[in-house]
Amino acid sequence: MNIPPEKMHNLEIKKHSRVDLLLLRSSDFHSFRKLQRDVDEMGLLSSTEQHLSGILTTLDNITDQDNTLYCLTQEGELIGMLKIGTKRLYLYNGKDLHCRSCACLLDFYIQRNFRKRGLGLELFNFMLKDKAISPSRLCYDNPSYKLQSFLKKHFSPCALIKQPNNFVIFAEYFGEPEMGPFGQ
């Protein structure tokens, strides 16, 4: 998975839904296994960097939990990923507790040697456009300091509010009209 940073061409973002992955597994098992190895390895890197005891992202949990995975590849090699899904959460707005189905960013990782090149922002913006959602309408699952800094840098001004369930939301989350998890 080590691609020299100076070779920054042939970048591609691929979206993998549960249905896409099940179809790939049944139609091209070799490609499925390669993707599975790459995603599982990157999921381990992401969890290790966040000092988590378990792995957040594997191809199995994408299909089991009906999440969506966005993969950033260069010349067929995985260099970044972003996992989103819908969760039923209790969110506190400062006065009341609200239970709702929420669009959530569950994992986001770019290989170390590809950071600080705008690739994370490109991947993040691709997901926002694909899901027709704004960053302030997402709930962020226990975001690392790096992710919080990323959000503040690229989507400023933003005040992030920690929730009792370890999710974080933008201060304006409750100020926007409520709709389905992904703008539906």
UniProtKB/Swiss-Prot annotation:
Domain N-acetyltransferase: 1-174
GO terms for biological process, alphabetical: regulation of microtubule cytoskeleton organization
Disulfide topology: none
Gene3D superfamilies reported in the protein's UniProt record: 3.40.630.30
Alphabetical list of PROSITE patterns matching this protein: GNAT_ATAT (PS51730)
A GO cellular-component term linked to this record: microtubule
InterPro entries given in the database record: Acyl_CoA_acyltransferase (IPR016181), Atat (IPR038746), GNAT_ATAT (IPR007965)
Matching SUPFAM superfamilies: Acyl-CoA N-acyltransferases (Nat)
Keywords from the UniProt entry: Acyltransferase, Transferase
Annotated catalysed reactions: L-lysyl-[alpha-tubulin] + acetyl-CoA = N(6)-acetyl-L-lysyl-[alpha-tubulin] + CoA + H(+)
Annotated GO MF terms: tubulin N-acetyltransferase activity
Site (Crucial for catalytic activity): residue numbering on this chain: 50
Coiled coil stretches, renumbered: none
Ranges annotated as spanning the membrane: none
Pfam families: Acetyltransf_16
Keyword Acyltransferase on entry: yes
Top EC class for this record: transferase
Binding locations of acetyl-CoA: 108-121, 144-153
E.C. no: 2.3.1.108
Family as reported in the entry's similarity comment: Belongs to the acetyltransferase ATAT1 family.
Its job: Specifically acetylates 'Lys-40' in alpha-tubulin on the lumenal side of microtubules. Promotes microtubule destabilization and accelerates microtubule dynamics; this activity may be independent of acetylation activity. Acetylates alpha-tubulin with a slow enzymatic rate, due to a catalytic site that is not optimized for acetyl transfer. Enters the microtubule through each end and diffuses quickly throughout the lumen of microtubules.
Protein name: Alpha-tubulin N-acetyltransferase
